[in-house]
Curated annotation (Swiss-Prot):
The modification Phosphothreonine is found at T142. It comes from Saccharomyces cerevisiae (strain ATCC 204508 / S288c) (Baker's yeast). The keyword Aminoacyl-tRNA synthetase applies. This is Leucine--tRNA ligase, cytoplasmic. The lineage of its organism: Eukaryota, Fungi, Dikarya, Ascomycota, Saccharomycotina. A motif ('HIGH' region) lies at residues 66-76. Its main location: cytoplasm.
Length: 1090
C-alpha cells in the first residue's frame, strides 16, 4: 500500500463511490459494453469488410493482457486507462468500440512458485509450521481482507539485519508477508489454483474502475482453455508451414554444470538475460614484449610456428579503421588457448564461451596452455585488422574487467569516449604507466561524421561533459551511450570502402567483410551474469532448438511495411521499432518447463510466453461465440466444442480459405465467426508499456503480417512510459506502491481516472500524483452539488442571448468543445482534461462572476456539455449528471460527443482574453500603487476615493512596427538567430529598446504561429469591449475604492485623447512611462486619489 497521502475526511469520496457502484451495476444489467458485429441477417457475409466498416464504423483497442501471478497495480491501470479513454471517446463518435481483455498465464513464473511451495510443503508440512529453528523468527502478518499482490515478484520490506536472518527465504514466507492466511497457502502449490484465483480478481478490479470491457470475450491462455490451446496450435502450424519456424543451432544461455540450456525458470539470477552478440576481432601479435616473450619461449607446449591473436570483443566493427592501440588490464591473468591453426589470447571465461560455440577444436575444452599476467603484454607489437596503422602496441587500461567481453579492448579514440580519455591519460603520464610516448602518439583518424558532434564524436562528448579522467565512470557510461546513439543513427562513414553510407547500413557490411577475410568471427556471451539454480555461472552455447526466424529478409520487409503504415503517436516509438527490427533475429519458440500449449509437432516442448501472445487480439473477436467462461468449460452460443476448432476452421475464420471440407460445424456458425473477425479487424491500436517494444510488440507486428491478409494488419501501436507514484519509482520494498484495488478504494474510480489522465501521454515516464486524485474528488463533488442546485434555481435569466458575457461564454464553450475533441482524437488525454474540465470549469466561473445573473439556457448547455466532455475519462460522474440531474432516459455511454453549436467567433474570444488580462493588469497596478517605496509613502492612499483611468492607444509606436518588419524579413530568410544581422537593421540610438522587443518577438515565434505574431491588428474593438464591460473593469480593483472610472482613447504619441464614455477631448494624465507602454490591446492603467 502506498505510504503517501492520508485522506482525513472521506464523506465526499464515499458519496462519489456510491454513485460509481450504482452505475457499474446498471451498466452490467444493460450489457453496455457487450459489442457485437453486424449480424449476417443485417448484412450478407458477402459484404466486403471495408464496406462493412463504412456502413457500421467500429473501433477496437487492446492492451497487453496482464499476467496472472498477481493482481493489477497502478502501472497496469495507467496502460488500461489509455485504452479506456479511447474506447469511451470512439463510442461517442458513433462507433462500435470494443475493449476485450484476457488473462496471460503462459510461461514459468506461476509453475515455478507452485513447485517451490510443493517442495516447502514436503519440508515443513502443509501448514508450513515445521520451519528450521533459525527461521522461527519469521512472523505471520495479520491477513488483510483483500490484498493480493504479485507474489512472484514481491520484495519484502525488511532491514539488512532481517534479510541476513533469512526472512523471505521461502515462497510460503512471501505469501505470509503478503497477508495470505497460512492455511490458504497450500492451495497455491497447485498451479491451476493461480488460474482460478487471480482472473476473477482482475475482472472485479477493472469493473470497479468502470472499465468498458466486454468480459464475454475473456479467457485464460495455456491448455487450461482448450479453445485458446487449439488457436495457438493453429498459429504454430501456420508459421511452420510458412517457413517462419525452423529447427537449428541457436545461441542459448547454457549451464555447463547442468548440461542443458538454462531458461528463465532455471535461474537463480539473471532472469530475462539473453545472449549478446559481439565481433571477435583477431589482432595479431607481431613481437611480444620481453616479459611475455620469456613466458611463451619457456613453454614447450606452444607451437611457435603458429600465429598468436589477441581477441578483442567489439560491438562496433565499423570503427575498426580508427584503431590506435589495443588495451589489456595489467591485473588480469590471460590465457593462451589452442584455437586450432592459431592461438587465442583472452580470458578463460571468454574462451569457455567460445568453446561451446564451434570456435575451438574441442567442445567444452578451455584449459589454457600458458597463463600470462596482463602487465607482461604491455608494449607487445601488434597488427590490428582494418586499422590505418600497420603496427600498433598493447597498452594498459585499468578499467578493463575480466567479467565482460574478452578482457582485450581495441582502442578507437575517434568514437569511444573511454578510449579517448584513456589515450589522453596515457599520453600525459607515460612514465607512470611504464610505456614509451611513441607507442601511444598516433593521430586520431576521423571515421564517421555525425550531425551533432562532427568528425570526432568521442572528443566532442568528453569535452562537452567535462570528463577529466578514466575514473569518471558515471560520466563515461553516459558519454558511451550518447556516442553510440549519435554515431549509429546520424553518422555517415567518411573513411573506408563504405564512405558516404550511413553508419547503420555500413556496420553489417564491415562485419561481413572482416569475417569473410578471416579477421574476425561472431562471438556471444550472456549480456549480464546469469547464475543457474545449481550455482553455475552460465555461458552461451550453440544448441539445436525450434525458433522463430525473425529478421529473415522478406519477412522483415513486410514488418517494416506494416510499421510504415501504422499510427505510432510519437517519433521515438518509430525509432525504437526500427532499431529492434534492425537487430532482432531468431527467437526460441519453446521451453520444456512451465504452463502453455504443446508444440503440435514436438509435444515435449511448450510454446513459450512471448510466442503465444502475438495475435491473441484476433481470438478476442470470436471468443464469446465459442465459450461462456474463462476456461472454455461451458460451450458458447454457437454450440461448438473445442475439438471442432481445427486448423481448417481457423483458416476459414481468418480468411485463408473460403470453405471448410472436413467439419461438422454448420455454415451459418462459421460465417458468424468470420463476420466477427472481419468486422473488428484490423486492430485499431494496441497499447502497452514502451519496455515491450523489443519483444512483445515487435513479435505482434511480425506474426500479424505472416498470418493475416494485408487489410487486417494492425493500424496502430501506442507505447507509454512507466508510471511513477508521487514522483518516485513504484516499489513494493519501499511501500511506494498501489494496486488497482487500493487506488480505487482510496480515491474512487473517477478521481483515480482523472489522475491517470493527468499523469501524462508521452513515452517518457508519467506520474500519478495522489494530490491530483484527491483534488479531483473535491472538484467532482462540488460540481455535482452545484449542478443539482443550479438546475433548481428560479432566478436565472431567460430570453434572448444579447449580453456581451452571455455571447462570450457561448463562444468560449464552443471553442473549448472543439479543442477537447481535437485532443481526444489525438489521444492527448492530459490536454483533453485541461480543456474539457479545468478550462471549461474556469470559463463557467468567470461567466458566473462577470455576468451577475447567468442565463438559464447557457447553464443548461454547460451542465450537459460538461458531462459529455468528461464521459470518456469520468463516466460515472457523467452518467449521474446526464441521467439524474438532466433527466435523460438513456445512458451517457450512448450519447454523442458534443460539437460547437455555431462557428467560433475569434474576435469575441480575443475580447474576452483582453478583459481578463486587463483585470489582471488593474490588480497588478493596484499592488504597485499601494507599495511603499524606500523613504516615501505609497502613491495612492487606500483610505480615500480613487479614480481609475485606462489609456487606450489607437496605434503602435513606429519603432515597434519597424522592428516587426525586421523580424518578419529575417524570419523568412531564416537568419533571425544571427544577432549580428539583426543589429545591422537597427539604428544605434534605437538599440536599447529595440533588442529586448525583438527578443520578445523571437520567443513568441518559438511558441506561436508566425501569422499570429506578425498580424498585430486587433480582432475586436477595444473601445466597444471596455464600454460593454465597464462595470466589470471598475470592479477589478480589490483593495482600492474606485469612485470614478474613465477611459481615454488616443493616437500613439498624442498629448490629448477622447473620453470613450462622454466623447469629450481630454488631456492625457502626465504619466510618461505608462503612456509610452500603452499599445493596442494593452492599455495603460492609472490610479489617482480624488
Amino acid at each position: 500500500m502506498s505510504s503517501g497521502l492520508v485522506l482525513e475526511n472521506t464523506a465526499r469520496r464515499d458519496a462519489l463511490i456510491a454513485i460509481e457502484k450504482k452505475y457499474q451495476k446498471i451498466w452490467a444489467e444493460e450489457h453496455q459494453f457487450e459489442i457485437d458485429a453486424p449480424s449476417i441477417e443485417d448484412e450478407p457475409i458477402t459484404m466486403d469488410s471495408e464496406e462493412l466498416h463504412r456502413t457500421y464504423p467500429k473501433f477496437m483497442s487492446s492492451m497487453a493482457y496482464p499476467y496472472m501471478n498477481g493482481v493489477m497495480h497502478a502501472g497496469h491501470c495507467f496502460t488500461l486507462s489509455k485504452v479506456e479513454f479511447s474506447i469511451g471517446f470512439e463510442r461517442m463518435n458513433g462507433k462500435r468500440a470494443l475493449f476485450p481483455l484476457g488473462f496471460h498465464c503462459t510461461g514459468m513464473p506461476i509453475l515455478a512458485c507452485a513447485d517451490k511451495l510443493k517442495r516447502e510443503a514436503e519440508l515443513f508440512g502443509k501448514n508450513f509450521d515445521n520451519v528450521p529453528a533459525e527461521e522461527e523468527e519469521i512472523k505471520e502478518e495479520t491477513p488483510a481482507e483483500k490484498d493480493h499482490e504479485d507474489v512472484t515478484k514481491f520484495k519484502a520490506k525488511k532491514s539488512k539485519a532481517a534479510a541476513k536472518k533469512g526472512r523471505g527465504k521461502y515462497q510460503f514466507e512471501i505469501m505470509l508477508q503478503l497477508g495470505i492466511p497460512r492455511e490458504e497457502i497450500i492451495k497455491f502449490a497447485d498451479a491451476k489454483y493461480w488460474l482460478t484465483y487471480f482472473p476473477p480478481l482482475c475482472e472485479s478490479d477493472c469493473t470497479s474502475l468502470g472499465a468498458r470491457i466486454d468480459w464475454r470475450r475473456s479467457f485464460v491462455t495455456t491448455d487450461a482453455n482448450p479453445y485458446y490451446d487449439a488457436f495457438i496450435r493453429w498459429q504454430m502450424n501456420k508459421l511452420k508451414a510458412a517457413g517462419k519456424i525452423k529447427f537449428g543451432e541457436r545461441y542459448t544461455i547454457y549451464s555447463e554444470k547442468d548440461g542443458q540450456a538454462c531458461m528463465d525458470h532455471d535461474r537463480q539470477s539473471g532472469e530475462g538475460v539473453t545472449p549478446q552478440e559481439y565481433i571477435g576481432v583477431k589482432i595479431e601479435a607481431l613481437e611480444f614484449a620481453d616479459d611475455a616473450a620469456k613466458i611463451i619461449d619457456s613453454s614447450s607446449d606452444l607451437d611457435k610456428s603458429k600465429k598468436f591473436y589477441f581477441v578483442a570483443a567489439t560491438l562496433r566493427p565499423e570503427t575498426m579503421y580508427g584503431q590506435t592501440c589495443c588495451f589489456v588490464s595489467p591485473t588480469i591473468e590471460y590465457g593462451i588457448f589452442d584455437a586450432g591453426d592459431s592461438y587465442f589470447i583472452t580470458t578463460e571465461r571468454a574462451f569457455k564461451n567460445m568453446s561451446y560455440q564451434k570456435l575451438t577444436p574441442k567442445r567444452g575444452f578451455y584449459k589454457p596452455i600458458v597463463t600470462v599476467p596482463g602487465k607482461a603484454f604491455i608494449g607487445t607489437k601488434i597488427h590490428a585488422p582494418q586499422s590505418v596503422y600497420p603496427e600498433l602496441r598493447i597498452l594498459p587500461m585499468e578499467t578493463v574487467i575480466a567479467t565482460k567481453g574478452t578482457g582485450v579492448v581495441t582502442c578507437v579514440p575517434s568514437n569511444s569516449p573511454d578510449d579517448y580519455i584513456t589515450t589522453k591519460d596515457l599520453l600525459h603520464k607515460p612514465e607512470y604507466y611504464g610505456i614509451k610516448p611513441e607507442w601511444i602518439d598516433h593521430e586520431i583518424v576521423p571515421i564517421m561524421h555525425t550531425e551533432k558532434y562532427g568528425d570526432l564524436t568521442a572528443k566532442a562528448i568528453v569535452e562537452e561533459k567535462k570528463i577529466q579522467s578514466p575514473k569518471d565512470k558515471n560520466l563515461l557510461a553516459e558519454a558511451k551511450k550518447i556516442a553510440y546513439k549519435e554515431d549509429y543513427y546520424t553518422g555517415t562513414m567518411i573513411y573506408g570502402p563504405y564512405k558516404g553510407e550511413k553508419v547503420e547500413q555500413a556496420k553489417n557490411k564491415v562485419k561481413a567483410d572482416m569475417i569473410a577475410a578471416g579477421e574476425a568471427f561472431v562471438y556471444n556471451e550472456p549480456e549480464s551474469q546469469v547464475m543457474s539454480r545449481s550455482g553455475d555461472d552460465c555461458i552461451v552455447s550453440l544448441e539445436d532448438q525450434w525458433y522463430v526466424d525473425y529478421g529473415e529478409e522478406s519477412w522483415k520487409k513486410q514488418a517494416i511495411e506494416c510499421l510504415e503504415g501504422m499510427q505510432l503517436f510519437a517519433p521515438e516509438v518509430k525509432n525504437a521499432f526500427e532499431g529492434v527490427l534492425d537487430w532482432l533475429k531468431n527467437w526460441a519458440v519453446c521451453r520444456t518447463y512451465g504452463l502453455g500449449t504443446r508444440l503440435p509437432w514436438d509435444e515435449k516442448y511448450l510454446v513459450e510466453s512471448l510466442s503465444d501472445s502475438t495475435i491473441y487480439q484476433s481470438f478476442y473477436t470470436i471468443a464469446h461465440l465459442l465459450f461462456k467462461d474463462y476456461y472454455g468449460n461451458e460451450i458458447g452460443p454457437l454450440g461448438i466444442s473445442a475439438d471442432q476448432m481445427t486448423d481448417e476452421v481457423f483458416d476459414y475464420i481468418f480468411q485463408h480459405q473460403d470453405d471448410v471440407k472436413n467439419t461438422n460445424i454448420p455454415l451459418p456458425a462459421l460465417q458468424k465467426l468470420r463476420r466477427e473477425f472481419e468486422y473488428f479487424y484490423p486492430l485499431d491500436v494496441s497499447i502497452s508499456g514502451k519496455d515491450l517494444i523489443p519483444n512483445h510488440l515487435t513479435f505482434f507486428i511480425y506474426t500479424h503480417v505472416a498470418l493475416f491478409p494485408k487489410k487486417f494488419w494492425p493500424k496502430g501501436i501506442r507505447a507509454n512510459g512507466h508510471l511513477m507514484l508521487n514522483n518516485s519509482k513504484m516499489s513494493k520494498s519501499t511501500g511506494n506502491f498501489m494496486t488497482l484495488e487500493q487506488t480505487v478504494e482510496k480515491f474512487g474510480a473517477d478521481a483515480a481516472r482523472i489522475a491517470f489522465a493527468d499523469a501524462g501521454d508521452t513515452v517518457e515516464d508519467a506520474n500519478f500524483d495522489e494530490s491530483n486524485a484527491n483534488a479531483a474528488i473535491l472538484r467532482l463533488f462540488n460540481l455535482k452539488e452545484w449542478a443539482e442546485e443550479i438546475t433548481k434555481e428560479s432566478n436565472l435569466r431567460t430570453g434572448e442571448i444579447t449580453d456581451f458575457f452571455d455571447i462570450a461564454f457561448e463562444h468560449e464553450m464552443n471553442a473549448l468543445i472543439e479543442k477537447t475533441y481535437e485532443q481526444y482524437a489525438l489521444t492527448n488525454y492530459k490536454n483533453a482534461l485541461k480543456y474539457g474540465l479545468f478550462d471549461f470549469q474556469a470559463a463557467r466561473d468567470y461567466y458566473r462572476e462577470a455576468s451577475g445573473v447567468m442565463h438559464k439556457d447557457l447553464i443548461a448547455r454547460y451542465i450537459e456539455t460538461q458531462a459529455l466532455l468528461l464521459a470518456p475519462i469520468a463516466p460515472h460522474f457523467a452518467e449521474y449528471i446526464y441521467r439524474e440531474v438532466l433527466g435523460n432516459q438513456t445512458s451517457v455511454q450512448n450519447a454523442k460527443f458534443p460539437r460547437a453549436s455555431k462557428p467560433v467567433d475569434k474576435g469575441v474570444l480575443a475580447a474576452l482574453d483582453y478583459l481578463r488580462n486587463l483585470q489582471r493588469s488593474i490588480r497588478e497596478g493596484e499592488g504597485q500603487a499601494l507599495k511603499k517605496k524606500k523613504g516615501k509613502s505609497a502613491e495612492i492612499d487606500a483610505s480615500k476615493p480613487v479614480k481609475l483611468t485606462l489609456l487606450i492607444s489607437e496605434s503602435f509606436p513606429e519603432w515597434q512596427s519597424q522592428c516587426v518588419e525586421i523580424v518578419r524579413k529575417l524570419f523568412s530568410e531564416q537568419t533571425l538567430d544571427d544577432n549580428k544581422k539583426v543589429r545591422e537593421h537597427i539604428e544605434p540610438k534605437e538599440m536599447k529598446r529595440a533588442m529586448p522587443f525583438i527578443s520578445l518577438l523571437k520567443q513568441r515565434l518559438a511558441n506561436e504561429k508566425p501569422e499570429d505574431v506578425f498580424e498585430r491588428e486587433l480582432q475586436f474593438s477595444e473601445i466597444d469591449t471596455v464600454k460593454a464591460a465597464a462595470r466589470n473593469v471598475k470592479k477589478a480593483a480589490q483593495a482600492l475604492k474606485i469612485a470614478e472610472f474613465s477611459a481615454i482613447s488616443f493616437p500613439y504619441g498624442a498629448k490629448t485623447g477622447k473620453d470613450i464614455f462622454t466623447g469629450e477631448e481630454v488631456e492625457i494624465p502626465p504619466v510618461t512611462k505608462i503612456v509610452e507602454n500603452a499599445v493596442p490591446g494593452n492599455p495603460g492603467v492609472v490610479f489617482q486619489n480624488i
